[in-house]
Amino acid sequence: MSNLRIVCQHCPSVVFNNKRPDVVKRPTMSAMLHSETQEDLETDDFFLLKDPFAFDNVSVSKPLANNYKLLACADCEKGPLGYYDSKNNEYLLLCSLEKN
């Protein structure tokens, strides 16, 4: 399995440089933040991580009203790069951050 390297879009910090995680479909950040229910939500591709220590440089926000937390670059504090789902203990990093 190859490595995945994600660099912050706003500064030169490496956010993730580790084994390529599994890709899963989860609700988009917009849908997750604005929906009352979890039914029929628009989805997006995310890299799934269970261990916060797999990241090189990420910060996690305080819980939002729906108990999700946003992921951001720990150096420049810009994001969101994805979100943390505390109910399922999933750190979800946007696949769109990968540069081809």
Curated annotation (Swiss-Prot):
Keyword Amino-acid biosynthesis part of the UniProt annotation: no
Residues the entry annotates as binding Zn(2+): 8, 11, 73, 76
Source organism, top-level taxon: Eukaryota
InterPro entries noted in UniProt: Mss4, Mss4-like_sf, Mss4/transl-control_tumour
Any one GO biological process: small GTPase-mediated signal transduction
Keyword vocabulary terms for this entry: Guanine-nucleotide releasing factor, Metal-binding, Protein transport, Transport, Zinc
Domain MSS4: 1-100
Transmembrane segments annotated in the record for this chain: none
GO MF, one example: guanyl-nucleotide exchange factor activity
Record-linked PROSITE patterns: MSS4
Keyword Transport among UniProt keywords: yes
Cellular compartments per GO CC: cytosol; membrane
Function: Guanine-nucleotide-releasing protein that acts on members of the sec4/ypt1/rab subfamily.
Family, per entry: Belongs to the DSS4/MSS4 family.
Name of this chain's protein: Guanine nucleotide exchange factor MSS4 homolog
Organism whose genome encodes this protein: Schizosaccharomyces pombe (strain 972 / ATCC 24843)
Gene of this entry: dss4
